[in-house]
């Protein structure tokens, strides 16, 4: 059963019944490669999350990096302009998990047993464990003018992204299913 504090921040349709049917979404994830849960957070919850993020922003650190879309080492067997070696850039500000208060909505969602059970069923996993890295399990990322998250393939089995504030312009989120591999091999 959803705790009261989560009921107050989740969107209207995300109730106990919704979270009891994680396996219902497995087929959609398998065929589409992505699931989008619109209005997952209520307007009230979103306002609280935005305030939490704004209150922490002064503690954020600036991070910039360059990488190829595979987030792997340069491969000299391919040309520099090959998709395998094309360089992307990311710049952002970040708050690591150790600076996010224990009573934060993000912490409550992350450690919620009912939400974890939902994703276990959805992903057909016997167990999901919280990420033990004290910095990386939950992050708040800020993208100010000129910042960007460069295109890349995720290296994890799955990623959960919670968009707390839309950008004023730009910010196109792109997702392509079944693009990385061809005949069981990475397709450059």
Predicted regions and their residues:
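Short glycine-enriched loop/turn motifs at secondary-structure junctions
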Residues: 29-33, 101-102
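Long, compositionally biased
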Residues: 78-81, 158
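Signature of the catalytic double-stranded beta-helix
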Residues: 41-43, 48, 52-55, 60, ...
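Fe(II)/2-oxoglutarate
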Residues: 1-31
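Short, solvent-exposed beta-strand-terminating loops
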Residues: 50-51, 55-77, 176
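A structural signal for short hydrophobic/aromatic patches embedded in well-ordered alpha helices
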Residues: 25, 33, 48-50
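Short amphipathic
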Residues: 35-41
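Catalytic core of non-heme Fe(II) oxygenases with the double-stranded beta-helix
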Residues: 98-107, 116-188
């Amino acid at each position: 059963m959803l705790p009261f504090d989560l009921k107050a921040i989740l969107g209207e349709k995300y109730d106990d019944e919704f979270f009891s049917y994680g396996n219902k979404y497995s087929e959609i994830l398998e065929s589409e490669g992505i699931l989008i849960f619109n209005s997952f957070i209520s307007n009230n919850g979103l306002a609280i999350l935005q305030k939490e993020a704004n209150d922490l922003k002064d503690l954020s650190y600036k991070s910039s990096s360059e990488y190829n879309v595979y987030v792997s080492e340069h491969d000299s067997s391919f040309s520099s302009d090959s998709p395998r070696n094309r360089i992307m850039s990311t710049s952002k500000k970040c708050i690591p998990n150790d600076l996010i208060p224990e009573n934060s909505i993000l912490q409550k969602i992350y450690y919620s047993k009912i939400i974890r059970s939902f994703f276990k069923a959805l992903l057909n996993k016997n167990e999901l464990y919280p990420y033990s890295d004290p910095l990386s399990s939950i992050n708040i990322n800020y993208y100010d003018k000129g910042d960007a998250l460069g295109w890349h393939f995720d290296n994890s089995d799955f990623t959960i992204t919670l968009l707390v504030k839309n950008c004023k312009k730009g910010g196109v989120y792109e997702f392509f299913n079944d693009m990385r591999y061809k005949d069981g091999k990475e397709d450059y």
